[in-house]
Design a protein with these regions (language model features):
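Secondary-structure boundary/capping residues
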Residues: 207-208, 255
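N-terminal secretory targeting modules
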Residues: 1-176, 186-188, 204
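Catalytic nucleophile-elbow at a beta strand-turn-alpha helix junction centered on a G-D-S/GDSL motif
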Residues: 170-195, 216-219
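Oxyanion-hole/transition-state-stabilizing segment in secreted/luminal serine hydrolases
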Residues: 186, 215-262
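Short amphipathic alpha-helices and their capping/turn segments at secondary-structure boundaries
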Residues: 160-169, 190-204, 225-242
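Extended interaction regions within the primary functional domain
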Residues: 123, 157, 193, 221-223
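Structural recognition of the beta-strand scaffold that forms the well-ordered cores
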Residues: 172-177, 181, 208-214, 244-250
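Aromatic-Pro/Gly-enriched surface loop or interdomain linker
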Residues: 199, 213-216
Length: 262
């Protein structure tokens, strides 16, 4: 699994700072495995982000906030639960054992520390609800119902990629696109972007990684929302582990919005 990271405007930030809060986010994976690592990003922010802990857990069939307690797995970073990511930087967790099933929804909960950027590194068009709770005096427990009662936003924060160990014969396709790829017109929390359908079809025959690197409003050359495709290509495509195929589905915003001729 992977997503394209972006600068977060004020309108896409939570109502309150992420400082001393817990944010539960949900991703829909393509294929499964038993060994993985998580990539976190602070690449679009100007201040460090302090993280107290990060843990994974299976959710139920509805892909919501609820987690199955026996599946909770805390990740480490160089052997420690807490980590600080500098501005403009990203990092991987230590490799961890976790039974990940093909096509499942996985919760990733980040417990933030005191220091968080004014503008987080995010992906605006998650088409999936994230659940944020206050934790000033304590860290919210995995099964805490306050996740359901807390603030809800349809964005991902600080998530970049989830790498699953597999053999070299497993194909992985990355998709570079704009809003059509990002999920415009799909149903929030239903995991029905066209790349989700592609993943389902491909994985019906064999394990097949499908990485959605779409950004709504994105352009190829210049303008649009977030960094244009030509600028983000190295990070978002070449920077992904195991990719051996590429779909480029961009250009409509360049044609429709640009005053230049290319």
């Amino acid at each position: 699994w992977a997503t394209a990271v972006e600068y977060t405007g004020q309108g896409d930030m939570p109502k309150e700072s992420l400082s001393n809060r817990s944010c539960r986010q949900i991703v829909h994976v393509s294929f499964g495995g038993n060994v993985l690592r998580l990539k976190l990003s602070n690449e679009q922010s100007k201040e460090p982000v302090e993280i107290k802990s990060v843990y994974l857990a299976d959710t139920d069939d509805d892909c919501n906030w609820f987690v199955k307690g026996k599946t909770v797995k805390y990740l480490t970073f160089n052997g420690r639960k807490n980590v600080s990511i500098g501005p403009g930087k990203s990092l991987y967790s230590d490799v961890a054992k976790y039974h990940l099933k093909a096509g499942q929804c996985l919760t990733i909960t980040i417990d933030y520390g005191k220091q968080t950027p004014e503008h987080a590194t995010s992906h605006r068009g998650s088409r999936t609800t994230s659940y944020i709770v206050n934790g000033l005096h304590r860290t919210a427990r995995p099964m805490d119902k306050s996740f359901d009662d807390g603030e809800k936003v349809d964005h991902w924060y600080n998530l970049s990629a989830l790498d699953v160990m597999t053999d070299k014969s497993t194909p992985v396709v990355a998709v570079l696109g704009n809003s059509i790829t990002d999920g415009r017109g799909s149903t929030t929390n239903m995991q029905n972007r066209w790349t989700d359908f592609l993943s389902d079809e491909l994985n019906a025959e064999r394990p097949y990684g499908v990485l959605n690197l779409g950004i709504g409003g994105n352009c190829v050359v210049e303008g649009g929302l977030s960094e244009p495709a030509m600028k983000r290509f190295d990070r978002d495509i070449l920077g992904q582990a195991g990719v051996d195929k590429l779909i480029i589905f961009e250009g409509t915003n360049d044609i429709g919005c640009s005053k230049k001729n290319y």
